[in-house]
Curated annotation (Swiss-Prot):
The keyword Transport does not apply. Disulfide bonds join 83-133, 90-136. This is Interleukin-15. It comes from Mus musculus (Mouse). Induction: By type I interferons, double-stranded RNA, or lipopolysaccharides. Belongs to the IL-15/IL-21 family. GO terms for molecular function: cytokine activity; cytokine receptor binding. GO terms for biological process: cell maturation; extrathymic T cell selection; immune response; interleukin-15-mediated signaling pathway; lymph node development; macrophage differentiation; natural killer cell differentiation; natural killer cell proliferation. SUPFAM superfamilies: 4-helical cytokines. Residues 1-29 form the signal peptide. The gene is Il15. It comes from the Eukaryota.
Length: 162
């Protein structure tokens, strides 16, 4: 099971930047550009994370064909685009229930990967206050299959807006 490290995707840019600025390191501006270039390598790249989350959710969908999961989870099936961060946080909280209730190793690894990728991508939006959104406990309880289908739809919404 691999957990992607999206913050290490553009390391070659810093090498090119080093060669480009090699003759300009003695100037203050050259040093600032070099430092900013090095810092930018460590910044998270979120474009592909939602695609990876969707891939893992589809993998979970295929896994549950062979595993009997008889649980109901709070599911936001008709989320409003202005409440997508709140809805995503609810989906992630509910997904943790699967980790506690089921012991299938492949399923749990994939769920952990979804949680890691989604939380790292959402980290900048975690504290966004969205008014008029339902609390997780106010949502309707649905089967795990319906939960996954709604989860994939909201992830697709994040993909389309990024």
């Amino acid at each position: 099971m691999k957990i992607l490290k999206p913050y290490m995707r553009n390391t070659s840019i810093s090498c090119y930047l080093c060669f480009l600025l090699n003759s300009h390191f003695l100037t203050e501006a050259g040093i600032h550009v070099f430092i900013l270039g090095c810092v930018s390598v460590g910044l998270p790249k979120t474009e592909a994370n939602w695609i990876d989350v969707r891939y893992d959710l589809e993998k979970i969908e295929s896994l549950i064909q062979s595993i009997h999961i008889d649980t109901t989870l709070y599911t936001d099936s008709d989320f409003h685009p202005s409440c997508k961060v709140t809805a995503m946080n609810c989906f992630l909280l509910e997904l943790q229930v699967i980790l506690h209730e089921y012991s299938n190793m492949t399923l749990n690894e994939t769920v952990r990967n979804v949680l890691y990728l989604a939380n790292s991508t959402l980290s900048s939006n975690k504290n966004v206050a969205e008014s008029g959104c339902k609390e997780c406990e106010e949502l309707e309880e649905k089967t795990f299959t319906e939960f996954l289908q709604s989860f994939i739809r909201i992830v697709q919404m994040f993909i389309n807006t990024s």
